[in-house]
């Protein structure tokens, strides 16, 4: 039973179209949410110790959602937290485009992957001849990020991930119970999950999602190939996770739905 293991409280936060899509059929970055939705997402991220998202989501956006509001940064500091939550990329392969803006953002970066990745080279966004950032700039300890000279050394190269978590795998897929237990060992108590649909499906199937925030946006995307909040193999109706509606809030033309997953 997942309620008996030490793990973070996990909340899925997604914006969806009125017909339940999180992106269009060609999987363009989903930027159809309003400024209100973006502010809501930032609030949820600010309330979390870490943010989890899949490699596909990272490739689509190239960046991650960080806390920008001075008020929210101050709230985190008053709670004894670093200015930014940990940003965790989940990927079976550690191969990334080293020039993604994500690797220049002033956030702590972790990689969650399987044991088969241990001997694969990890990305460093520093181009040939480019100097490493000074420990006084965005990589300083004051931002909760390891300075370059303390970053991980993997396969003889400096990785731009501050920590790599090697979770157990089953059938080539991440063992999410093991992964969540490892996150708890690193004092991650609240986890925000931002997609994509395959990752959400895997964590939900493992019984590890506690709450969902869905922003219903006023557009129809359609398309049989357009991704949905929960992909994977799906659930039979009799075995589908049941939800309890906690709150409904309309802001402008959007509706914010807050659910708890029944155990």
Mark where each language-model region is.
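Enzymes that bind and transform nitrogen-containing heteroaromatic metabolites
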Residues: 1-121, 125-129, 137-139, 145, ...
């Amino acid at each position: 039973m997942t309620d008996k293991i030490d793990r973070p409280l996990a909340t899925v936060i997604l914006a969806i179209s009125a017909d339940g899509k999180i992106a269009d059929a060609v999987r363009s970055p989903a930027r159809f949410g309003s400024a209100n939705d973006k502010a809501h997402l930032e609030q949820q991220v600010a309330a979390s110790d870490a943010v989890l998202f899949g490699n596909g989501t990272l490739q689509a956006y190239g960046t991650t959602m960080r806390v920008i509001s001075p008020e929210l940064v101050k709230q985190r500091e008053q709670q004894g937290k670093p200015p930014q939550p940990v940003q965790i990329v989940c990927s079976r392969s550690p191969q990334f485009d080293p020039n993604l803006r994500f690797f220049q953002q002033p956030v702590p970066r972790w990689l969650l992957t399987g044991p088969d990745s241990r001997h694969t080279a990890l990305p460093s966004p520093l181009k040939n001849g480019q100097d490493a950032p000074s420990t006084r700039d965005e990589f300083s300890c004051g931002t909760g990020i390891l300075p370059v000279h303390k970053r991980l050394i993997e396969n003889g190269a400096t990785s731009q991930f501050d920590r790599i978590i090697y979770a157990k795998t089953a059938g080539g897929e991440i063992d999410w119970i093991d992964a969540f237990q490892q996150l708890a060992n690193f004092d991650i108590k609240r986890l925000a999950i931002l997609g994509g649909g395959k990752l959400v499906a895997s964590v939900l199937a493992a019984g590890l999602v506690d709450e969902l925030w869905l922003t219903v946006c006023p557009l129809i995307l359609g398309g049989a190939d357009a991704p949905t909040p929960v992909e994977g193999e799906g659930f039979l109706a009799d075995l589908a996770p049941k939800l309890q509606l906690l709150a409904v809030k309309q802001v402008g033309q959007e509706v914010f739905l807050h659910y708890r997953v029944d155990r």
